[in-house]
A protein has these predicted regions:
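Catalytic loop of short-chain dehydrogenase/reductase
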Residues: 2-59, 69, 82
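C-terminal helical subdomain
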Residues: 59-63, 67-68, 75, 79-125
Length: 125
């Protein structure tokens, strides 16, 4: 990110989308039980995204930093029986990489960054 931040800020356009997981939430359903190392690593990713977004002005410098939960997708990790295809799991990441952003936007969705997203919605963590 250090290498990419300056050119993205200069161009006033850029998106950093980091894959995480809803299992890294600190609140909400399914936030306890099993997979502790995985959960803790994803909680760390979510915290990193939040902090990087704040350090870069929450979009005011021209680029966004967000985390995405791709859900249980058919990948090497998700396995062949996962309910979503890899393409379906990637839809929110693609949306984040291409979405419009307005720091002064009229809706909350227009000006959110530094959060965890799932199915194009913010996931409280």
């Amino acid at each position: 990110l250090n290498i990419l931040a300056a050119p993205m800020a200069e161009a006033r356009a850029g998106r950093v989308v980091i894959f995480s997981a809803c299992l890294g939430r600190m609140s909400g359903p399914g936030n306890t039980g099993g997979l502790a190392p995985y959960r803790v690593s994803k909680a760390g990713v979510n915290a990193l995204v939040r902090n990087l977004a704040h350090e870069t002005g929450l979009g005011a410098r021209g680029f966004l930093v967000d985390a995405v939960c791709p859900n249980h997708s058919r990948t090497d990790m998700g396995g062949p029986d996962a309910p979503l295809s890899a393409a379906e799991g990637a839809q929110t990441a693609i949306w984040l990489a291409t979405r419009a952003f307005d720091v002064n936007g009229s809706s909350e969705g227009d000006k959110l960054t530094g959060v965890l997203w799932e199915e194009m919605k913010v996931v409280p963590w």
